[in-house]
Curated annotation (Swiss-Prot):
SUPFAM superfamilies: Actin-like ATPase domain. It comes from the Bacteria. This is Xylulose kinase. The active site is at D240. Belongs to the FGGY kinase family. Substrate binds at M82, H83. GO terms for molecular function: ATP binding; D-xylulokinase activity.
């Protein structure tokens, strides 16, 4: 067997390790799960040691159960869950459990940042201060755990801690660093303004590197633990969204990525950070040196479908439930669904809005409700596509990944609502493929990530908008756009009633 690279995808619930050859083929894979701790409502934590032990287990399993040998692994890189805070002391020992991206304890710190900096915060970081980001977590520890704060000497993000344990080198790549909202989006350096005004030592911030930068080799200690070779080179890696964009070939501004996971993401490549989205969309550094991406997040994309399935069709599999939508019509026989069942982030940033079915009629069947859910999720994405188009974007292709790419019907619905060609990936591997591409480019197998994509990224069938369908969906979308404004005060009042009773 020829040379391979490893793409290590450190997710929220599991790590997946993929061995990829020079033709972009997945030749071996292994994964391992780890636990999530929720000691209090709104808290979400993990033990960083679990990331190390489970990654090691996955690597050992890959080597033992495949024909890949340690000497064939020329390099590796990472994709990582974003925003999680890992605090280290002067000996680089972890001080407390990592506070994860989905931890919501930091609302008061976010409000303080808004009050102190106003719109300047968006100008500096490209983002609003949201609970998921790392800076509010730092401020929470500073305010609530002063003894730990006094001992802290540096902070890392999840994949950066894993990289440190494998190489002994402390660093953070810039694509992940933007998600801390402590990075100056214009200079791509740590913001001295924020650090000084918030009394955060600049020395707490780790050295910054590019995603494809060479960091070091696997150290002797980790080589003995994992079975890897000390000759294997290690490269920076990227935040999961950046790595996912690389793995999907989102390398130019005429393509958008639509991802339907638990939440939903619409992501666009950006040459610079100059477009003013007024904080509605997040700005992040891309895995490409000097490039960026922006993205809008909807909170309950796949979650809405999962909720519907578990509530109304618990004994059926997802494929059967989704396929039943074919029994309905475009526009679900005049039924609309707003997928705000856990609130919304973009474009509304509203924690109190809730979902609704609009237009329920005695003639509606379950298939109509399924179709309305599928269409409503895509209408929520169309809100973000329209925001991009309002700011001058012209998309020729939309790449669909995740749950929305597993159904031909849903792919056609996307093409018709977006009025754009939609493609899926032939062999969807998620951010792990992007991590492998970063390693392959870092090694010099390819001159650039774009060159690597020519070999590694392949698209499946293209779905084109049907003119008659587009016209019908545009009428439905105009009605859909009224739902938020009309239902917001009602659902906020209902939420308050639930809290009181």
């Amino acid at each position: 067997m020829s040379a391979v690279v490893l793409g290590i995808d450190l997710g929220t619930s599991a790590v997946k390790v993929s061995a990829i050859d020079k033709q972009g083929n997945v030749v071996a894979q292994a994964s391992a799960k780890y636990a999530l701790q929720q000691p209090h409502p709104g808290y979400s934590e993990q033990d960083p040691e679990d990331w190390v032990t489970q990654t090691t287990q996955a690597i050992r399993e890959l080597l033992q159960q495949s024909e890949v040998t340690a000497d064939q692994i020329e390099g590796l890189s990472y994709s990582g869950q974003m925003h999680g805070l890992v605090l280290l002391d002067e000996s680089a020992t972890v001080l407390r459990p990592a506070i994860l991206w989905n931890d919501t304890r930091t609302t008061s710190q976010c409000r303080e940042l808004e009050s102190q900096f106003g719109d300047d915060f968006i100008k500096i970081t490209g983002n609003r201060p949201l609970e998921g980001f790392t800076l509010p977590k730092l401020l929470w520890v500073k305010e609530n755990e002063p003894n730990i704060w006094k001992r802290a000497r540096t902070f890392l993000l999840p994949k950066d801690y894993l990289r440190y344990r494998m190489t002994g080198k402390l660093a953070m790549d810039k694509s992940d660093a933007t998600g801390t909202v402590l990075l100056d989006i214009t200079t791509s350096q740590w913001s001295e303004t924020l650090c000084n005004q918030l009394d955060i030592p600049l020395t707490l911030c780790p050295p910054l590197i590019e995603s494809t930068a060479y960091v070091g080799h696997i150290n002797q200690t980790y080589a003995q633990l994992s079975g890897l070779s000390v000759n294997t080179k290690v490269f920076g890696g990227a935040a999961d969204n950046a790595a996912g964009a690389v793995g999907a070939g989102i390398l130019s501004s005429d393509k958008a990525l639509v991802s339907i996971g638990t939440s939903g993401v619409v992501l666009k490549y950006e040459d610079n950070a100059q477009t003013d989205y007024r904080g509605v969309l997040q700005y992040e550094r891309h895995a490409f040196p000097g490039k960026y991406y922006s993205m809008g997040v909807t909170l309950a994309a796949g979650y809405s479908l999962n909720w519907f399935k578990q509530t109304f069709a618990p004994d059926e599999d997802f494929g059967t439930v989704v396929a039943s939508a074919e029994q309905s019509t475009i526009g679900a026989n005049g039924l609309l669904f707003a997928p705000y069942i856990v609130g919304e982030r973009a474009p509304y940033a509203d924690a109190t809005i809730r979902g609704s079915f609009i237009g329920v009629d005695g003639s509606h069947q379950r298939a109509d409700f399924v179709r309305a859910v599928l269409e409503g999720i895509i209408f929520s994405f169309e809100d973000l596509i329209k925001l991009y188009q309002h700011n001058g974007a012209e998309f020729k292709t939309i790449v669909s990944i995740g749950g929305g790419a597993k159904s031909a019907l849903w792919l056609q619905i996307q093409a018709d609502i977006f009025n754009c060609k939609v493609v899926s990936l032939k062999n969807e591997q998620g951010p792990g493929m992007g991590a492998a591409m970063i390693a392959a480019t870092g090694l010099g197998w390819f001159k650039t990530l774009a060159d690597c994509a020519q070999t590694f990224v392949h698209y499946g069938k293209a779905y084109y908008p049907v003119t008659a369908h587009v016209a019908q969906y545009q009428e439905m979308y105009r009605l859909y756009q009224q739902i938020y404004v009309q239902t917001q005060p009602i659902t906020a009042g209902l939420l308050e009633q639930r809290k009181q009773h």
